């Protein structure tokens, strides 16, 4: 009886591991979501899409889950200090949600070797475990956009090349915030006060 249970356990473990192996045709891309209408989504959003038709996988990992109903949410958001976590959803649900919100979705497929795709996917799966999900959000240095860069660098050993756009012009954090909050002057004022000299 013990041998059968052990064999069954090994078989189940193998199937879970096998199901997590990406096929050679799998693609990993970065999704960039345009601005939303409220303060907490005024700066857009980012996520990793894992699309593997051969394995019937089409999911999005993102680092933008937060406790919206937490007391003092907007004050903590304006201060740039909240507990955030990684989440995962089907691409279909993510796409439908942002289309419903009338927000743009841009996709950039990453030029990765098979081993790099698997390493990045494995990192995301491990990061999604309950004990690894949460992180302390920082308005400028640790958010859904910086996590894309940091996760890619960590999972792939700093082998990704980031190209600076030709039209890049250095700007202060304050200028960048104001560019995104012109329609919400109270939000802009609140962030200015909460962050003060940091920006």
Feature roles, as predicted:
Residues 27, 45, 58, 107-109, ...:
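Extracellular structured ligand-interaction cores
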Residues 30, 48-50, 61, 108-112, ...:
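Generic structural hydrophobic/aromatic packing signal, biased to beta-strands
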Residues 23-102:
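Glycine-rich catalytic cores of cysteine/serine-nucleophile enzymes that process amide/ester linkages
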Residues 1-21:
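Bacterial Sec-dependent N-terminal signal peptides
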């Amino acid at each position: 009886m013990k041998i059968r249970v052990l064999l069954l356990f090994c078989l189940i473990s193998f199937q879970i591991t096998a199901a997590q192996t990406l096929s050679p045709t799998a693609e990993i891309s970065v999704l960039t979501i345009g601005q939303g209408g409220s303060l907490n989504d005024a700066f857009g959003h980012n996520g990793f899409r894992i699309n593997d038709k051969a394995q019937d996988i089409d999911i999005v990992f993102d680092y933008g889950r937060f406790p919206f109903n937490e007391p003092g949410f907007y004050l903590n958001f304006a201060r740039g200090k909240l507990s955030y976590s990684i989440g995962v959803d089907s691409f279909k649900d993510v796409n439908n949600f942002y289309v419903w919100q009338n927000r743009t979705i841009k996709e950039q497929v990453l030029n990765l070797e098979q081993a790099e795709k698997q390493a990045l996917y494995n990192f995301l799966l491990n990061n999604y475990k309950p004990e690894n999900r949460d992180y302390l959000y920082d308005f400028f240095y640790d958010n859904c956009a910086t996590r894309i860069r940091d996760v890619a660098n960590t999972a792939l050993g700093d082998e990704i090349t980031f190209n600076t756009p030709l039209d890049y012009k250095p700007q202060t954090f304050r200028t960048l915030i104001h560019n995104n909050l012109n329609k919400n002057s109270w939000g802009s004022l609140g962030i200015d006060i909460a962050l003060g000299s940091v920006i």
